[in-house]
Amino acid sequence: MKLSEMRNKVTGLPDGFAGTKKDWKDVAETFRIEKAAILEKDKKDESGEVILYKKGPKQGQPVPDRQIAMQLRTASGEAVLVRTNSPRIVTLYTGDLDRECDEVNRFGDRIYHVEAPEGELKFVPYEMDKKKDGKPLKWDVADLEEVD
């Protein structure tokens, strides 16, 4: 099974999703990210619109929430939105989606969290984000269900 197929199966992305611009338009509608998810809470512009980034693509203008998935993909190279079950963390997958994968290590080491403290995106390797006694925890794809 190709990694792209495994990712679609695990995340619920539609069959045939390949990460093209059209796919992302479709999936951005499906996986709508709450505006508060990637922003400094309650930060608004003069018109009262919530600002998604301190510096958006057009010098700080508000970004419609349906565009966030596509922008995160652009910002991280080949990122694919995996899940958004936290108000401020978005988990992305990056890498070669055509390589073969197995059940034990389906996502390799290419899972990242995107944290947005105060509206600024910051990439953190997933395995470094979960620690116990100061040491990174070993994880597998089941951990994706436990991200909070």
Predicted regions and their residues:
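Acidic, low-complexity, intrinsically disordered interaction modules
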Residues: 57-65, 92, 101-105, 130-131
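Short acidic, glycine/tyrosine-flanked loop/strand segments centered on an H-E-D-like triad
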Residues: 75-100
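OB-fold ssDNA-binding interfaces and closely related basic DNA-contact patches used
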Residues: 1-84
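Short nucleic-acid-contacting surface segments enriched for D/E, G, S/T with interspersed K/R
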Residues: 92-121
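Intrinsically disordered, low-complexity segments enriched in proline/serine/threonine
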Residues: 16, 59, 64-66, 89, ...
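OB-fold/S1-family single-stranded nucleic acid-binding modules
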Residues: 110, 115-117, 121-148
